[in-house]
C-alpha cells in the first residue's frame, strides 16, 4: 500500500507521511520568530523578495486576528491564509456571542483543532503551515504559542518556525532572559532572526504588540536596531578570534 499517498492511514512504523510532508513544507518556508517580554510580544519574519512593481504589503507573513492577537506563519502562504481566515472568523463569532474578546489560549486550541482535523479527513490534505500566535489576555499578561501541521500546540517564551529554525532556537535557548523590555525583545528577536537570514533590515519585517496597541516597526527604526545587532555580532566574532589565537 502507498502510505505516502493515504492521508488517514498510518504506515507500519507509525508514520503519517502526509503530515510529515506538511512539516517539510514548513521547514522550507521563510523563517519567523516570536519573543515574549515583560509587557510586549515581538514578531519578526524573514521578508519574501518581491518583484519591482509588486506591492510588498500584500506579501506580509504577520496577520492580525483580533485587536489583541496576532499571528506569524511559515510554510505555504495559501494554506496560511486559510488558517488565518478560520481564526479571524472564530474571533468575530466569539465577540458576537459573548460581547468580549477571545482568550489567546482558547483561540490557539481552535487553530490547532482546525489543523488537526485536516490530518484525518479524506478528500483533503494537512495544512503545510506552522504558526506563532501571540496576544494579551484580560489580565494583561502576554502569551506566546506555536501550532504545527499535526495539530499540536504549545506555549513558548520565544519560538521559531521555518527554515533554519533549529539554529535560531539554539541561539534563543542560550540567550533568552525573562522579563525583557520592549527594546531588549526587539534586539533579541532581530539577533535571533539574523542567525537564519541574510544580514540587512531590508530582509526583515517586525511587529511590536503591546497591550492595547500594535505597530509595524518603521524602516528607519528597524535599520537602527539591525546596525546595533550587526556591530555586536562583529565584536563577538573578534573576541572569539582573539581567544582562539591566545589558545
UniProtKB/Swiss-Prot annotation:
One of the record's GO cellular component terms: nucleolus
InterPro entries: Ntn_hydrolases_N, Proteasome_alpha, Proteasome_alpha-type, Proteasome_asu_N, Proteasome_sua/b
UniProt-listed GO biological process terms: ubiquitin-dependent protein catabolic process
Main location per the UniProt record: cytoplasm
Domain of life from the UniProt record: Eukaryota
Subcellular location(s) of the protein: Cytoplasm; Nucleus
Pfam families the record matches: Proteasome, Proteasome_A_N
Keywords assigned by UniProt, alphabetized: Cytoplasm, Nucleus, Proteasome
Family to which this protein belongs: Belongs to the peptidase T1A family.
Quaternary structure, from the entry: The 26S proteasome consists of a 20S proteasome core and two 19S regulatory subunits. The 20S proteasome core is composed of 28 subunits that are arranged in four stacked rings, resulting in a barrel-shaped structure. The two end rings are each formed by seven alpha subunits, and the two central rings are each formed by seven beta subunits. The catalytic chamber with the active sites is on the inside of the barrel.
Functional summary from the UniProt entry: The proteasome is a multicatalytic proteinase complex which is characterized by its ability to cleave peptides with Arg, Phe, Tyr, Leu, and Glu adjacent to the leaving group at neutral or slightly basic pH. The proteasome has an ATP-dependent proteolytic activity.
Annotated protein name in UniProt: Proteasome subunit alpha type-7
Organism whose genome encodes this protein: Trypanosoma brucei brucei
Amino acid at each position: 500500500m502507498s502510505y505516502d499517498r493515504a492521508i488517514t492511514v498510518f504506515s507500519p512504523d507509525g508514520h503519517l507521511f502526509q503530515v510529515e510532508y506538511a512539516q517539510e513544507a514548513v521547514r522550507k518556508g521563510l523563517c519567523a520568530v516570536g519573543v515574549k517580554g515583560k509587557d510586549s510580544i515581538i514578531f519578526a519574519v524573514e521578508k519574501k523578495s518581491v518583484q519591482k512593481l509588486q506591492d510588498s504589503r500584500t506579501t506580509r507573513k504577520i496577520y492580525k486576528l483580533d485587536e489583541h492577537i496576532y499571528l506569524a506563519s511559515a510554510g505555504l502562504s495559501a494554506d496560511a491564509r486559510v488558517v488565518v481566515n478560520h481564526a479571524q472568523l472564530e474571533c468575530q463569532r466569539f465577540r458576537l456571542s459573548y460581547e468580549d474578546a477571545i482568550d489567546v489560549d482558547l483561540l490557539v486550541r481552535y487553530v490547532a483543532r482546525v489543523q488537526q482535523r485536516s490530518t484525518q479527513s479524506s478528500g483533503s490534505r494537512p495544512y503545510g503551515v506552522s504558526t506563532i500566535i501571540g496576544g494579551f489576555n484580560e489580565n494583561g499578561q502576554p502569551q506566546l504559542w506555536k501550532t504545527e501541521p499535526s495539530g499540536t500546540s504549545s506555549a513558548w517564551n520565544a519560538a521559531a518556525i521555518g527554515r533554519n529554525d533549529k539554529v535560531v532556537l539554539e541561539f534563543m535557548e542560550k540567550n533568552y532572559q525573562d522579563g525583557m523590555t520592549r527594546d531588549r525583545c526587539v534586539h533579541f528577536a532581530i539577533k535571533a532572526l539574523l542567525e537564519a537570514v541574510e544580514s540587512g533590515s531590508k530582509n526583515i519585517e517586525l511587529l511590536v504588540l503591546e497591550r492595547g496597541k500594535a505597530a509595524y516597526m518603521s524602516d528607519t527604526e528597524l535599520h537602527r536596531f539591525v546596525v546595533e545587532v550587526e556591530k555586536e555580532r562583529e565584536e563577538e566574532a573578534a573576541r572569539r578570534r582573539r581567544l582562539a589565537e591566545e589558545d
